[in-house]
Amino acid sequence: FYTEVKIMLKGKTVVLGVTGSIAAYKIANLASMLVKQHADVNVIMTHNATNLINPITFETLTGNKCLVDTFDRNFEFNVEHVALAKRADIFMVAPASANVIGKMANGIADDMLTTTILAAKCPKLVSPAMNTNMYENRIVQDNIKKLEQYGFEMIKPAEGYLACGDTGAGKMPEPQTLFNYIMRTIACEKDLAGKNVLITAGATQEKIDPVRFITNHSTGKMGRAIAENCMLRGAHVTLVNASVSVEPP
């Protein structure tokens, strides 16, 4: 999905908020993917996140200063959290710890990340990542629902083996999935919003008799590309896969 060489985020400012979850290291790959699409990527880290991945990693990948300290004076703008919030076309907090989710849900702004997202009016995506018991805790679930009511889009965590040794929900989706969310949100004008599109892709088969059928060598790439484009433009897409050699979007 989105593996072809395209320049779809040129002129867009993407802000990534990285919190103290073990999945923080994966965001380096996401930042690199966004930079390859010519996005202006800015990373804000909590102090806890810096114990898991060095800010220099993000500065090297994005070419921008990684913001951590609210009172750091070594940057261009006078009120950086407000200036960056105004420039942002999209704000993604990933991985989002239970702590930061609670702060955002209750308007607490005590660091660079929470003050900036409080000032942002752009689309805001949040990808929770934590232990299963923490994620399923009623307090955390209430905070997630509250953020959804405030207009945040929550990215459902995957299920699987977690760093703590448990197996269950709470795993941050892979960078490709997060990248897809960003692309669908800001890459194109949503001129197909509200439309339902049905697409067939791949090598279809037409039966001749109980033994034989007519088919073709289609890989499904054309159907996949059309489905991808329609999704980016806001359509609700139903993709019917026949025998294909590519992954569906």
Where are these regions (language model features)?
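A cross-family phosphate/adenosyl-ligand binding-site feature
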Residues: 4-125, 131-220, 224-249
